[in-house]
């Protein structure tokens, strides 16, 4: 039975311990800021206060007290009124308040400041706190302030310099600081003005360079457009060598007869003109494949000259037709230059540009004639190969040259230079139809 009774009384022990701890915590929490709990009396007791010139060492209050709690004297330049206050620093009359020291401070009392230093004054409507005792420089004082009358002479008299050194008054220090700030502001203004002027100069130089490098108007729109273009075409034709039309004779005696001829025939002006006419016919018709340039033996050159002499009568009729059509194209070309002067290619109708783009494509000729395409036209405008490689057709080229500032007459001039008179004729006809201008009367083509 006793064993059973011990088991029934054991659960009450934790409850008793918890209740005692809660009651002790309640006693500690009832103590004030400067009180500690006395376990002997079970009451809150006041912490021992410190005397003047002393401050508490360690902590005491709110029910707790350090074992080594006590009071220690204040260090130098600090004071305390006693009680539970810590030591505080004396007023810095000269450094902070800009005033004279009336009474120096000690361990029990604070320092007392007197009147303002020379060159400083106190505000009349000052706040009623510690900042109301601050003195301000006479440089910022309103006129007729009595403390600042004769501040310059008084400041220099009250602050004499020591032997071998010079001492500036507070008034002179303030004046020096303000003058330094003024010089800094002036330097900043000059620097900003210089940067602004340089930026404007750079912009003007860039604009002048752009205007200077802008392409000028084409020569086709001058007083004699047809003649200038014709001269340009003739110059391009002269730079190219005439293709050698080589004829291989089967008769052996005829070949030996030609090789035995001592006199070498010379080309006449009619032969040279016929060769140029053949080149122009390839550009207009775009259906003949030019023969590759070859450098053979003297016998082959003689054969070529003989062949040209035999075909002189046959090519004369064809050259007359080519010249007639060439003159017609140049007349229409000159008329179009005057109509669309200053317009860009993208201002033309879409169908007109698309038709010209198809004519300049590499798949335009069914017989695979070797003619200049829109890529050659792009090279004549000075575009780089990587830029041309990013294009797919002539429409993109027209957009590119329009963005670069080229006009329709310049486009026609480039087409003439690359020997695409067929494209020039088609584009001029579409432009005249779009502009509502009657084309010049054309002569009938001569039979070729």
Curated annotation (Swiss-Prot):
Its main location: membrane. CDD domains: TNFRSF_EDAR (cd13421). It holds the Pfam family Death_EDAR. Residues 209-448 are cytoplasmic. The keyword Signal applies. GO terms for cellular component: apical part of cell; membrane; plasma membrane. Glycans are attached at residue 38. It is linked to Ectodermal dysplasia 10A, hypohidrotic/hair/nail type, autosomal dominant: A form of ectodermal dysplasia, a heterogeneous group of disorders due to abnormal development of two or more ectodermal structures. It is an autosomal dominant condition characterized by hypotrichosis, abnormal or missing teeth, and hypohidrosis due to the absence of sweat glands. Ectodermal dysplasia 10B, hypohidrotic/hair/tooth type, autosomal recessive: A disorder due to abnormal development of two or more ectodermal structures, and characterized by sparse hair (atrichosis or hypotrichosis), abnormal or missing teeth and the inability to sweat due to the absence of sweat glands. This is Tumor necrosis factor receptor superfamily member EDAR. It comes from Homo sapiens.
């Amino acid at each position: 039975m006793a064993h059973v009774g011990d088991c029934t009384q054991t659960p009450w022990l934790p409850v008793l311990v918890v209740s005692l701890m809660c009651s002790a915590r309640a006693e500690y929490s009832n103590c004030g800021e400067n009180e500690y709990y006395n376990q002997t009396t079970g009451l809150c007791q006041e912490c021992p206060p410190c005397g003047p010139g002393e401050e508490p060492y360690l902590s005491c209050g709110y029910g707790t007290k350090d074992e080594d709690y006590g009071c220690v004297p204040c260090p130098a330049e600090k004071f305390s009124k006693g009680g539970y206050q810590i030591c505080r620093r004396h007023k810095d009359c000269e450094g902070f308040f800009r005033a004279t020291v009336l009474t120096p401070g000690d361990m029990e009392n604070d320092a007392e400041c007197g009147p303002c230093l020379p060159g400083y004054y106190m505000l009349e409507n000052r706040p009623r706190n510690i900042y109301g005792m601050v003195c301000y420089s006479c440089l910022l004082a309103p006129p007729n302030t009595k403390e600042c009358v004769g501040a310059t002479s008084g400041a220099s008299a009250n602050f004499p310099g020591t032997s071998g050194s010079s001492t500036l008054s507070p008034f002179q220090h303030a004046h020096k600081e303000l003058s330094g700030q003024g010089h800094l502001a002036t330097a900043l203004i000059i620097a900003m003005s210089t940067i602004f002027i340089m930026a404007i100069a750079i912009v003007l130089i860039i604009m002048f360079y752009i205007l200077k490098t802008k392409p000028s108007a084409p020569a086709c729109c001058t007083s004699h457009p047809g003649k200038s273009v014709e001269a340009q075409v003739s110059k391009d034709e002269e730079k190219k060598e005439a293709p050698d039309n080589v004829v291989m004779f089967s008769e052996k005696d005829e070949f030996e007869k030609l090789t035995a001829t001592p006199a070498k025939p010379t080309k006449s002006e009619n032969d040279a003109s016929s060769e140029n006419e053949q080149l122009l016919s390839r550009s207009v018709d775009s259906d003949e494949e030019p023969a590759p340039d070859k450098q053979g033996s003297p016998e082959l050159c003689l054969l070529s000259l003989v062949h040209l002499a035999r075909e002189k009568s046959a090519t004369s009729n064809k050259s007359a037709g080519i010249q007639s059509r060439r003159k017609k194209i140049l007349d229409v070309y000159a008329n179009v230059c005057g109509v669309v002067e200053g317009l860009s290619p993208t201002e033309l109708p879409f169908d007109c540009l698309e038709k010209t783009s198809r004519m300049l494509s590499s798949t335009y000729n069914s017989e695979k004639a070797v003619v200049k395409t829109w890529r050659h036209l792009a090279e004549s405008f000075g575009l780089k190969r990587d830029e041309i490689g990013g294009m797919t057709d002539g429409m993109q080229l027209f957009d590119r040259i329009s963005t670069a500032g080229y006009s329709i007459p310049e486009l026609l001039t480039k087409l003439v230079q690359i020997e695409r008179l067929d494209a020039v004729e088609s584009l001029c006809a579409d432009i005249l139809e779009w502009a509502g201008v009657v084309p010049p009367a054309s002569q009938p083509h001569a039979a070729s």
